[in-house]
From Swiss-Prot:
Superkingdom, taxonomy of origin: Bacteria
Gene name, Swiss-Prot/TrEMBL: mecA
Quaternary structure and partners: Homodimer.
Organism whose genome encodes this protein: Lacticaseibacillus casei (strain BL23) (Lactobacillus casei)
Protein name: Adapter protein MecA
Family: Belongs to the MecA family.
Length: 228
């Protein structure tokens, strides 16, 4: 781990994959639990701020920039104190993690699945939410590298992507939004996806209940962001 104090209010920390491994953390571990992210970032702050110049009641911002080699973390303080009333109004107690919006949705565990109720194909070839089940593909991937390759190849349109780990294997679930894509277009995208894995008999409901969701709603976009 490398640390650079940019100024009195900002510290830059470079964490390699080995540093993350020593702490029992991977980038994927940070995707699903906002409290885990906050706890991890504060543990890093405790390590690098040996002089305790960042007071515990000051507002702190964590800006994370992941890469294939690890991640870079900018820790900044505003110099303003967090009073009790402000703390009561926020779960994060003055903490902010700055990442692109769709990555923020992954980190905070936001779920857009309520947009995916019941889908079908209408006379124009488009998915109709009122008439039939969802158009969905559950893909079993040989390894994580195949997922990265798939993310680099497929620009998903009219749907969402969720990545799960179940029984030491990775599964990608592609679900297509109602009224946004024709059945032919959906099947074309599924054909591309199946070049990187095998169609699985498991359902997304089984994976959701018994597996571990690693990336939610925008798994392909998230992978392209983190693993450039």
């Amino acid at each position: 781990m490398e640390m650079e104090r940019i100024n009195a209010n900002t510290i830059r920390v470079m964490l390699g994959n080995d540093d993350l491994a020593q702490r029992g953390i991977t980038v994927l571990d940070l995707l699903g639990n906002h409290k885990q992210i906050e706890s991890f970032f504060y543990s890093i702050l405790d390590e690098v701020d040996k002089d305790h110049t960042f007071a515990t009641n000051e507002a702190v911002t964590f800006q994370v920039m992941p890469s294939q080699s690890g991640l870079e973390l900018l820790i900044s303080r505003s110099g303003q104190k967090n009073d009790d009333s402000a703390a009561d109004q926020t779960d994060d107690e003055g903490t902010d993690t700055q990442v692109p919006d769709y990555i923020r949705q992954q980190l905070q565990g936001l779920d857009a699945s309520d947009q995916q109720d019941h889908q079908a194909v209408d006379e124009g070839g488009y998915i109709d939410a009122d008439k039939a089940p969802q158009t969905e593909l559950v893909l079993k991937l040989k390894d994580f590298e195949d997922f990265i390759s798939l993310a680099d190849t497929l620009r998903l349109e009219g749907g969402k992507s969720d990545l799960y780990r179940y029984k030491n294997a990775y599964y990608l679930v592609l679900t297509f939004y109602p009224n946004e894509i024709s059945s032919d277009e959906a099947h074309d995208q599924m054909a591309v996806a199946m070049e990187f894995g095998d169609r699985s008999p498991l359902s997304s409901a089984v994976l959701s209940e018994y597996g571990k969701r690693l990336m939610e709603t925008s798994a392909l976009e998230t992978a392209r962001y983190y693993f450039k």
